[in-house]
């Protein structure tokens, strides 16, 4: 069994359902400390974070390449629906099954072993390697990567390149990498009316009727046209509620929850202003609470994307696609301190599902791609 596969199995065997790390980071720290990494545990409200750095011959003047990832996994769902226990690494038909196999314990193991091989082959490497690992990516993400980034900001730590080990591939390892992500902003809208008997509408004020024209306009609005890297911004309703459940009562308020997934073609302030303008045009009496969970980020073509594309091509023969599709990731926090952030990991077809798995034939090639990137950028 390869070193990468063995470490992957050890990590899967630890039931690290968010935010419980279950000592996964301790296992990684033992391996990294043996290589000369300075390892720091940063705990926050039940979340475990790791910042580990190995400086190169150039010291703090050298380029720093960080790997960012998470040890936490989503809950298993009904255990009886799993073909094998989710925290017992199991091989069937050339695949390794277990919660976290694809998202993202294979990536964690692959970069640890890639670092071991790189340091052994290049003991005098010039640049620095770092690991930024959290147990709060699958949860609220309020005490994980964002806390470490804030700490690094206060220290003036410079990160030149960052690979996030999210499962970005589609059908084959390396066919897709993410060089950016859309931002995410949610709104909680309460439209006020006047409750009353449904037979006497002149004595009441129906907030559903008041909201409907504005809702139609918001749904039809083209917020932007996107750009060469991002599709157009989208606005979607996630929840709509009004009424008491009775059939003879006009409700006193209507509650709407919605979400923007927005590109670099729009801003938080611009989108908020346009929503308020539409609501105001319809004369609504309302309250609106905003929540921004992430800003869009984009890494243009540069040293990191070139190195990753070259490594994937050398290892797999594939020409990778740079993409910004999908949901948010911790890359949105890291982009605050790092100009080049790219996500790359194994295929994502089974993530968060019953019987999550990874094709074993991708495990060592993933490690090799990571090692090739290290060799190109910081050797």
UniProtKB/Swiss-Prot annotation:
Which cofactor(s) does the record list?
Answer: Zn(2+); Co(2+)
Q: Which CDD domains match?
A: M20_DapE_proteobac (cd03891)
Q: Could you tell me the keywords of this UniProt record? A: Amino-acid biosynthesis, Cobalt, Diaminopimelate biosynthesis, Hydrolase, Lysine biosynthesis, Metal-binding, Zinc
- The entry marks the following residues as binding Zn(2+) 2, namely 103, 138, 352
Q: In which pathway does it act?
A: Amino-acid biosynthesis; L-lysine biosynthesis via DAP pathway; LL-2,6-diaminopimelate from (S)-tetrahydrodipicolinate (succinylase route): step 3/3
Q: Which InterPro entries match?
A: ArgE/DapE_CS, Bact_exopeptidase_dim_dom, DapE_proteobac, Peptidase_M20, Peptidase_M20_dimer, Peptidase_M20A
Binding site residues for Zn(2+) 1: 70, 103, 166
Its function, per the record, reads:
Catalyzes the hydrolysis of N-succinyl-L,L-diaminopimelic acid (SDAP), forming succinate and LL-2,6-diaminopimelate (DAP), an intermediate involved in the bacterial biosynthesis of lysine and meso-diaminopimelic acid, an essential component of bacterial cell walls.
Q: What family does the Swiss-Prot or TrEMBL record give for this protein? A: Belongs to the peptidase M20A family. DapE subfamily.
**MF (Gene Ontology):** acetylornithine deacetylase activity; cobalt ion binding; succinyl-diaminopimelate desuccinylase activity; zinc ion binding
Question: Record's HAMAP family?
Answer: DapE
Full protein name: Succinyl-diaminopimelate desuccinylase
Q: Could you give the subunit structure recorded for this chain? A: Homodimer.
Q: Which species is this UniProt entry from? A: Burkholderia ambifaria (strain ATCC BAA-244 / DSM 16087 / CCUG 44356 / LMG 19182 / AMMD) (Burkholderia cepacia (strain AMMD))
Coiled-coil segments on the chain, per record: none
Per the UniProt record, one Pfam family is M20_dimer
Which residues catalyse the reaction? Answer: 72, 137
Q: What residue ranges are annotated as transmembrane?
A: none
What is one GO biological process annotated to this record? L-arginine biosynthetic process
**What does it catalyze?**
N-succinyl-(2S,6S)-2,6-diaminopimelate + H2O = (2S,6S)-2,6-diaminopimelate + succinate
